UniProtKB/Swiss-Prot annotation:
It comes from Sendai virus (strain Ohita). Residues 15-22 are annotated as: Involved in self-degradation and in host STAT1 degradation. This is Protein C'. Residues 12-34 are annotated as: Disordered. Its main location: host cell.
Length: 215
């Protein structure tokens, strides 16, 4: 086919002008469609990659950070530490019902007999009178004031119960010897230095229970 560009002196027929014009318009349309197609393809690929990246990121399991694991580990350690902690002597002193149960049969019988006399016989009356006078004569403390201001029958019962507690604290174990007796006093000595009323009651209990101790 002859070139679409003709010399200026040749007059182009009108039908040829139409053909060239249609061809040019068709080429422009094809070029524009290719550009749009390429642009759509690239956009689709980018969106697909972004979507895949988002989905992949959402499926990655989250792992607890080191800082989050520390509280759990510290709780476990604290629990184990408290499990192996030895009971304090003062905790044992305050649990009357669990004391004195492991004494030898002979000592246990003598201990229960002594406690029964404290609650029911003249020994108990003599004990509470001695304790009352010693507490009255001591340096004033909140605990001593509390006891001295009690009604007499209530005060006597409280002093007897406190004496029983100390008796069961001092006389316990398979067999209590004098060295065990003294060792238990040393165990509670720091507590008694702060609680003078308890010290007086413990000393009277010591005196009452001395005959039970095996040499």
């Amino acid at each position: 086919m002859a070139s679409a560009t003709l010399p200026a002196w040749i007059k182009m027929p009108s039908f040829l002008k139409k053909i060239l014009k249609l061809r040019g318009r068709r080429q422009e349309d094809e070029s524009r469609s290719r550009m749009l197609s390429d642009s759509s393809t690239q956009s689709y690929q980018v969106n697909q990659l972004t979507s895949e990246g988002t989905e992949a990121g959402s499926t990655i399991p989250s792992t607890p950070s080191k800082g989050q694991a520390l509280p759990t580990e510290s709780k476990v350690r604290a629990r184990e530490k408290s499990r192996h902690r030895r009971p304090k002597i003062i905790d044992q002193v305050r649990r009357v019902e669990s004391l004195g149960e492991q004494a030898s049969q002979r000592q246990k019988h003598m201990l229960e007999t002594l406690i029964n006399k404290i609650y029911t016989g003249p020994l108990g009356e003599e004990l509470v009178q001695t304790l009352y006078l010693r507490i009255w004569a001591m340096e004033e403390t909140p605990e001593s004031l509390k006891i001295l201001q009690m009604r007499e029958d209530i005060r006597d019962q409280v002093l007897k119960m406190k004496t029983e507690r100390w008796l069961r604290t001092l006389i316990r174990g398979e067999k209590t010897k004098l060295k065990d007796f003294q060792k238990r006093y040393e165990e509670v000595h720091p507590y008694l230095m702060k609680e003078k009323v308890e010290q007086i009651i413990m000393e009277e209990a010591w005196s009452l229970a001395a005959h039970i101790v095996q040499e």
